Amino acid sequence: MKIKIQKIHPNALIPKYQTEGSSGFDLHAIEEVMIKPHSVGLVKIGICLSLEVGYELQVRTRSGLALNHQVVVLNSPGTVDNDYRGEIKVILANLSDKDFKVQVGDRIAQGVVQKTYKAEFIECEQLDETSRGSGGFGSTGVSKA
């Protein structure tokens, strides 16, 4: 699949996959952003893109940022719809007790292209019964036993 990319800032970098087996590509910051502890920051990527109809871009947390700095994509996965043509931006949340400084060029998130499907919604009076029913939020337990 080919994705058209428009750089709208001189610091913008064209995304690339780091390894042959990578499903995600890195998204790079175009400016410095200081994110205070237990706060969020909006990080600009400096690119716009054009996806094929039937696909979306999911913006996901980089595992190293989560593990080493407790910094995550707040709405992970963030969705970039195929008809959006604006600048890609990432909402980062700093869950740590320390300031987190994003530097120009830092790989702050990863993008994954995913197929999308349109559902047809059918209103009904009652849903089919299942053994689970309406149980949720831990209703199936957490232990193996």
Curated annotation (Swiss-Prot):
| Enzyme nomenclature, EC number | 3.6.1.23
Sorted alphabetically, the Gene Ontology BP terms of this entry are: dUMP biosynthetic process; dUTP catabolic process
Q: Which domain of life is it from?
A: Bacteria
Molecular function per GO: dUTP diphosphatase activity; magnesium ion binding
Under the heading InterPro entries, the entry gives: dUTPase (IPR008181), dUTPase-like (IPR029054), dUTPase-like_sf (IPR036157), dUTPase_trimeric (IPR033704)
Q: Which CDD domains match?
A: trimeric_dUTPase
Q: Which cofactor does it need?
A: Mg(2+)
Record keywords:
Hydrolase, Magnesium, Metal-binding, Nucleotide metabolism
* Membrane in keyword set: no
Q: What class of enzyme is it?
A: hydrolase
Q: List the pathway annotation.
A: Pyrimidine metabolism; dUMP biosynthesis; dUMP from dCTP (dUTP route): step 2/2
Q: Would I find Hydrolase among this entry's keywords?
A: yes
Name the positions where substrate binds.
62-64, 75, 79-81, 89
Q: Name one Pfam family in it.
A: dUTPase
Could you tell me what reaction this enzyme catalyses? dUTP + H2O = dUMP + diphosphate + H(+)
Q: What does this protein do?
A: This enzyme is involved in nucleotide metabolism: it produces dUMP, the immediate precursor of thymidine nucleotides and it decreases the intracellular concentration of dUTP so that uracil cannot be incorporated into DNA.
PANTHER family recorded:
DEOXYURIDINE 5'-TRIPHOSPHATE NUCLEOTIDOHYDROLASE
Question: Which family does the similarity line name?
Answer: Belongs to the dUTPase family.
Q: What is this protein called?
A: Deoxyuridine 5'-triphosphate nucleotidohydrolase
Question: Which species is this record about?
Answer: Helicobacter pylori (strain Shi470)
